[in-house]
A protein has these predicted regions:
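Core RecA-like ATPase module of SF1/SF2 helicases and allied nucleic-acid translocases
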Residues: 1-5, 15, 47-145
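Conserved interdomain hinge at the start of the Helicase C-terminal
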Residues: 29-54
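Conserved coupling/interface region of RecA-like P-loop/ASCE motor cores
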Residues: 1-34
Length: 145
C-alpha cells in the first residue's frame, strides 16, 4: 500500500519512488515493556482465518529473538510456524522469523518486533520488515527484556 511504501521510504531516506496507487491502513508504531505485552497485542490485531488474511508474520532482528517468541507462542498453545535457515517451506497462518530470512517472502500482515537498542543494522532490518507487508504493518519496540 502507499502507506507502507511511504513508511519504508522514511526508513531509507530515498525519495521520488513511484508508489502503487493502492491505499490501506496506516502503519502502527508502538512501544511495549516486554515480549508478553507484544504478543498480547499481536493477537488482538492478527486477522487470520476464513474471510480474513491467509498469512501473518512476526519478524525480529535475530534468530534468538525469533525463537524465543516462537517458544512463547507455542507455550500459550498457539498455532504458529517458525522459519529458520533450515526451513524449506512457508505455510499459511502465523509465522515467526528474522528479517534476513523473510527476504523474498510476503505476508498479508507483518508485526515487526525490535528491541530498544542502537544497532547499525536495525534500520535495514526495519526496512526489510516493512517491505514484506502486503496489507498491514505494525512496528513494535520492546523497551525492556
Amino acid at each position: 500500500t502507499m502507506e507502507i511504501a511511504r513508511y519504508a521510504e522514511k526508513l531509507t531516506g530515498v525519495k521520488d519512488v513511484e508508489l502503487l496507487k493502492r491505499h490501506g491502513k496506516e502503519v502502527i508504531e508502538e512501544n511495549f515493556q516486554n515480549e508478553d505485552a507484544v504478543l498480547d497485542e499481536i493477537f488482538l490485531k492478527a486477522k487470520l482465518g476464513e474471510d480474513e488474511y491467509e498469512t501473518a508474520a512476526i519478524i525480529t532482528m535475530t534468530e534468538a529473538e525469533a525463537f524465543t517468541l516462537y517458544q512463547m507462542l507455542k507455550a500459550r498453545g498457539e498455532e504458529v510456524h517458525y522459519i529458520d535457515r533450515n526451513s524449506s517451506a512457508f505455510k499459511k497462518g502465523l509465522t515467526v522469523t528474522t528479517f534476513y530470512l523473510a527476504k523474498g517472502l510476503e505476508f498479508d500482515q507483518v508485526f515487526g518486533v525490535f528491541r530498544d537498542i542502537e544497532n547499525p543494522m536495525q534500520n535495514q532490518a526495519k526496512y526489510i520488515c516493512a517491505t514484506r507487508a502486503l496489507h498491514e504493518l505494525y512496528m513494535y519496540q520492546v523497551t525492556k527484556q
